[in-house]
Amino acid sequence: MGLKITVHKIAMGDVEDPELYAAAPIMEFEKSAKGRWLTENSKQQMEYIVRPNPETYGWMVIIFAWLEEQDLTYYRLKWGE
């Protein structure tokens, strides 16, 4: 199944429909080299959650992926996270 890790965060302002406004940045992330690699190597489909961001009174989108230990090591070495 792999380990669930946070792979990307997107901060947004106070918008009326955060799911709608998050769509474009999520698609940009999925098209990046990091996003493509994670899509190919995640053991389950990546998922995201939208939460209130109390620091900015806006929203935070958090994207998760499931990686095996070997893939997680590669990910951390390649992207330094």
Ranges and model annotations:
Residues M1-M60:
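Positively charged, low-complexity terminal tracts
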Residues P52-E81:
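Short, compact, well-ordered microdomains
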